[in-house]
């Protein structure tokens, strides 16, 4: 296996983050069917995570297909290194953001590739590791960084943004109608003491919205908004898509899995614009969703939407 200088399975991240990395890749068969991996092909997984999609692509492109795996999370890369070790030097792993996929691919010798996949969801491991601060169902630091070296945490935004900016952020990225009430409640709470844990924030949001109604937790949209802002997710996606198209050889395919309407809208509009410009042919006229069986086995797949397109010129 080829790895970037200094890469190892023991990154300098908190020891509690080295719990067994678990993540079930969504729409696995559909991604492979969309990309059509073949022997000798070169592929990029821009969100390699635990290596689930990557392993399937490597199997389908045996015996000599190659894959570049990119991830900003060192725990994910460590898990990918272990899972993909049997594929030896067919695999190259690099730590970085898919926002810089063009540069990372060029540096690693992956240009004019046959396929690229992005799975934009937060992994089960990240959600279920309290220290990562993604879940409102645990007492944990209000972090939410996918890259543990990133400078801004959710706690920083919650405790420092002016009320109007906080309301705008929650409305824009969480599509939360109660954003003004939530922002007001957060500001009132932080005037008494800083809001530093996930359960604190969840309780503030729940009270601001008048308690829980229905199956969806009242804090769901606020947590989504903060996670998107902390990790600059939408801007990263907008930056990455044109680079991915440039990386594809004629006939090469891109498969993008989105998990909420903001992401899916960006993907849909980009693919349509590039198709109208004659650079892409859209394979999936409508986004592919997980089967009922997959949704039952993996409830987190319910919101997944896969779009596939092929480079034509």
Swiss-Prot record:
Q: Which residues bind S-adenosyl-L-methionine?
A: 51-53, 71, 98, 119, 126
Q: Which EC class does it fall in?
A: transferase
Query: Where does the protein principally reside?
Result: cytoplasm
Organism per entry: Roseiflexus sp. (strain RS-1)
Q: Which reaction does it catalyse?
A: cytidine(1402) in 16S rRNA + S-adenosyl-L-methionine = N(4)-methylcytidine(1402) in 16S rRNA + S-adenosyl-L-homocysteine + H(+)
Q: Which keywords, in A-to-Z order, does the entry hold?
A: Cytoplasm, Methyltransferase, rRNA processing, S-adenosyl-L-methionine, Transferase
- Listed EC numbers: 2.1.1.199
Q: Name one GO biological process term.
A: rRNA base methylation
Q: Which superkingdom, per the lineage?
A: Bacteria
Residues of the region (Disordered) are 293-313
Tell me the function of this protein. Answer: Specifically methylates the N4 position of cytidine in position 1402 (C1402) of 16S rRNA.
Tell me the name of the encoding gene: rsmH
Tell me what this protein is called.
Answer: Ribosomal RNA small subunit methyltransferase H
Per UniProt, subcellular location reads as:
Cytoplasm
Q: Which family does it belong to?
A: Belongs to the methyltransferase superfamily. RsmH family.
Which one of the record's GO molecular function terms can you name? rRNA (cytosine-N4-)-methyltransferase activity
The Gene Ontology CC terms held by the record are: cytoplasm
Q: Name one Pfam family in it.
A: Methyltransf_5
């Amino acid at each position: 296996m080829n790895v970037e200088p200094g890469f190892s399975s023991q990154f300098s991240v908190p020891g509690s983050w080295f719990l067994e990395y678990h993540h079930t890749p969504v729409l696995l068969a559909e991604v492979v069917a969309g990309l059509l991996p073949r022997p000798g092909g070169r592929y990029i997984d821009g969100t390699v995570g635990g290596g689930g999609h990557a392993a399937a692509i490597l199997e389908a492109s045996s015996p000599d297909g190659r894959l570049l795996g990119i991830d900003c999370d060192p725990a994910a890369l460590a898990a990918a290194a272990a899972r993909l070790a049997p594929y030896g030097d067919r695999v190259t792993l690099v730590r970085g953001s898919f926002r810089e996929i063009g540069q990372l691919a060029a540096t690693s010798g992956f240009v004019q590739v046959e396929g690229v996949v992005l799975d934009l969801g937060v992994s089960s491991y990240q959600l279920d590791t309290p220290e990562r601060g993604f879940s409102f169902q645990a007492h944990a630091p209000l972090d939410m960084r996918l890259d543990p070296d990133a400078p801004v945490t959710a706690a920083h935004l919650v405790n420092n943004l002016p009320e109007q900016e906080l309301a705008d952020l929650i409305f824009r990225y969480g599509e939360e109608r109660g954003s003004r009430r939530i922002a007001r409640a957060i500001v009132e709470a932080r005037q008494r003491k800083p809001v530093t844990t996930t359960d604190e924030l969840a309780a503030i949001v729940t009270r601001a919205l008048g308690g829980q109604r229905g199956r969806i937790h009242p804090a769901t949209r606020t947590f989504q908004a903060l996670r998107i802002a902390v990790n600059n997710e939408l801007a990263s996606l907008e930056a990455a898509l044109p680079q991915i198209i440039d990386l594809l050889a004629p006939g090469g395919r891109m498969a993008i899995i989105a998990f909420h309407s903001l992401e899916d809208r960006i993907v849909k509009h980009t693919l349509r614009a590039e198709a109208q410009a004659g650079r892409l042919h859209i394979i999936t006229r409508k986004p592919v969703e997980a089967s009922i069986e997959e949704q039952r086995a993996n409830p987190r797949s319910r919101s997944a939407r896969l779009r596939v397109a092929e480079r034509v010129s």
